[in-house]
A protein has these predicted regions:
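Short, well-structured alpha-helical segments
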Residues: 232-244
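Alpha-helical transmembrane bundle of multi-pass membrane proteins
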Residues: 1-224, 245-464
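Short arginine-rich
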Residues: 229-234, 459-463
């Protein structure tokens, strides 16, 4: 009995001595603006695309309409390639500020464009900012978060994206009757971009980046702001176990692919690849037409999908630091596979069957819900945890480039595959990728819940 009491008191004492969340939360909240902009810009052209094509003179040109939507992905790919270098050269805070600039400029060009060329240029610039911002935001949030809150704060990135997608849809309702209303949608996006650029001036720099630069005194000062003076010394002692700034050399691509940490880089790329090959973006793309066939308006369809996404994000926020990243990933991918199996079943039923649309809708909403619980937020958080401090920014940039390439390929080939092999086989391929992801995660992913970044890095050091 006394032993149990000692254990309870010890647990309570440990809980009471954890760094307060109020110190780090404001900085995380500012970084989350990047993910809001990410969601907003990916969804902002979906609803007003017809009005844009009419006003700019390319109505009926499906190639031009497709470019307006997808050129953002090309810009994001380019941005992701340089995001690691920018984050390492200028620091996380300055990198986030720099990512806001092309989003500000690009959105302004889109809002004032008089031709297709102007719209494409603006979307390309916005995409470049989106390629730089999200990976740096994930780095920043991971590096400034206390260990016991890192999962919770990491989930806020996905919530920001969900809110951005919902905002892109809902913002059109009150202004849709105004001539050229789509221009207002682009102008509105400049507000959070400006807030991001200005607010980062008051945010702390990543202590990990400062230490990597050999600026130890500044790193300790930032740790005090994030954790409080009580915990800063211990955190600095942990930080000193990593490679010192003077030992840091430039990280080359060949080192990421063939160096001592190539295994974790390969794992990170695989997780992002499986995330895209699960079919999530194809589901988002095709959801409106499926809902319309069921007699539901496309606007309402987007709201349903958006709500399912936000509910999943909220669940992830609550569970990430309780049951861990690995469990969430396994449950998420497995449930996504089962949800996709429902859509395979629906695709095999007769279109006239009264239950076919219910199966489609149930499978689709469950798929989005379970994606948002694990497969959506966990990879970006997990990778910033398992990558060593020395290669973290460059490795994250490489993995994000894989993400954007596959995002583009799935979007490009989805409708063609539907026509050539039918929905049964397409959904079956997505289903198989989800179950393959379960096996990959179960065999290769380390649980990082509650561990400091230093503990994770030491645990993953290759045995030479």
């Amino acid at each position: 009995m006394e032993d149990d009491l000692v254990l309870v008191l010890s647990a309570l004492e440990k809980e009471a001595t954890k760094p307060p969340w109020k110190l780090s939360f404001p900085h995380v909240l500012v970084a989350t603006i990047v993910s809001f902009l990410f969601g907003y810009h990916l969804g902002v052209v979906n609803e007003p695309l017809e009005s844009i094509s009419t006003d700019l003179g390319f109505v009926g040109n499906s190639m031009a309409e497709g470019l307006v939507v997808s050129i953002c992905l090309a810009g994001a790919f380019v941005g992701s390639l340089i995001s690691g270098r920018i984050a390492d050269e200028f620091g996380r805070c300055r990198a986030l500020q720099l990512s806001a600039l092309p989003m500000l400029l690009g959105a302004s060009i889109c809002a004032t464009s008089k031709s297709l060329v102007g719209m494409l240029l603006g979307r390309l610039l916005v995409g470049t900012g989106l390629g730089v911002g999200p990976p740096v935001a994930s780095l920043y949030v991971t590096e400034i978060s206390p260990a016991h809150l890192r999962g919770t704060y990491g989930s806020m990135i996905q919530i920001g994206s969900g809110l951005g997608l919902m905002g892109a849809l809902l913002i059109g309702f009150p202004v849709k009757t105004i001539f050229g209303w789509w221009r207002i949608c682009f102008w509105i996006s400049t507000i959070p971009a400006a807030i991001l650029a200005l607010s980062m001036v008051f945010c702390v720099e990543s202590p990990y980046w400062l230490y990597k630069q050999g600026r130890n005194i500044e790193a300790e000062a930032e740790l005090e702001k994030l954790l409080g003076s009580t915990h800063a010394k211990a955190a600095m002692a942990e930080l000193s176990k990593l490679e010192k700034g003077g030992e840091i050399t430039s990280v080359k691509l060949v080192e990421l692919l063939y160096g001592r940490h190539s295994r974790v880089v390969f794992l990170g790329s695989t997780l992002f690849a499986l995330q895209q090959l699960s079919g999530i973006n194809a589901v988002f793309y095709f959801s409106s037409s499926v809902f319309r066939r069921a007699g539901v308006s496309s606007n309402l369809a987007s709201v349903f999908v958006g709500i399912a996404n936000l509910i999943g994000c909220a669940v992830a926020l609550l569970l990430m630091d309780k049951i861990g990243r690995k469990v969430l990933l396994i449950c998420s991918f497995f449930s996504m596979g089962m949800s996709m199996a429902l859509q395979v079943l629906a695709a095999n039923l007769s279109v006239s069957s009264p239950n076919v649309f219910y199966l489609y809708l149930t499978g689709m909403l469950l798929f989005v819900l379970m994606f948002a619980i694990g497969a959506g937020p966990v990879p970006a958080l997990l990778l910033t945890e398992i990558f060593p401090n020395r290669i973290r920014a460059k490795a994250m940039a490489f993995c994000m480039s894989v993400h954007w390439v596959l995002n583009f390929m799935v979007g490009l080939m989805f409708l063609q595959l539907l026509d050539q092999v039918g929905p049964q086989w397409v959904y079956s391929m997505f289903c198989a990728c989800c179950f393959l992801a379960v096996v990959v995660v179960k065999q290769n992913v380390m649980e990082t819940k509650g561990k400091s970044l230093q503990e994770i890095e030491i645990a993953l050091l290759p045995r030479d």
